[in-house]
Structure formats: structure tokens, C-alpha cells
Amino acid sequence: MHGDGFSFAAPGSWTVTRTGTTVAASHGGDTVSVTTFRLTKPYRAQLWKQAVTELDQVAAKLAAELKGTVVASRTVKVGSSTARQYDLAFTKDGEQLVERITFVLLGRREYELLCRYEAGKDEPACSQLLASFRPA
């Protein structure tokens, strides 16, 4: 799948939607998506510590909006980029879900890679999203 400035792979049988700066693929309650945001100032590796602090706050706010909690946070590699990843646990329509959000910062772009799946279930689409994501 291709979006404005990125590409990624998702299971072929999933339904694809495109809205504004987001490309998403979904099947049942599972979703993977990539959304882009323009940063006001270019990101540089020297800003990593400050970026982590800010992203930690963003993740906590997103979890609160979902009436959930941040259950994990970690630094990961996405391609050659260092990225920050969060697992948010919440309940929707009586179903326990996990939303894994990975923030990739490159120059003036922020890429938000999202994967939502049922808690306790396998999440191969999340791994596929991270392994296949390529900024343009």
C-alpha cells in the first residue's frame, strides 16, 4: 500500500481505506494504518531524549481518550530509524483491545504506525506493518 510519502504491506484480504494523510487496512476488529504529520521543526537524532518525553505524554493522552492505559513503552528500530512504540490497552464494545502505536520521526515528518488487535490474540499484521514500512 502507498500513501503520501510512505508504503507498507498488510494482509491482502483486508479492506483498504484512504482518508487525508492516513492509509488503513482492516479485517474484523483488527486494523493497521499509517498516518503522517508535518513537524514544525525538523527532527534530529540529538533531540531523541526530548522526543521520547513528548511522545510519552502523547501516548498517555491517547490512552486516556480511549479510557485505557499505556501498558508498555519501548524504543524499537523501524528500518534504519529509531522509533518509539507504545501498547495501549482499552475496552471497546465489551472487547479487550490493544492499540500498538509506533512513532517514526524523520526530518519534518512524523509517521504514526498503528496496529489494533484483540488482547491475548496473535498480532502478525503488526509485525508485517513494522517490517514492511518504508518512508519515501
Regions found by a protein language model. Give the residues of each.
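Conserved polar/disulfide-associated segments of primarily extracytoplasmic proteins
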Residues: T19-E112, R116-P124
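Generic hydrophobic secondary-structure signal
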Residues: F6-F8, V78, L113, L129-L130
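Short non-domain terminal segments
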Residues: D4-F6, L88, I101, A131
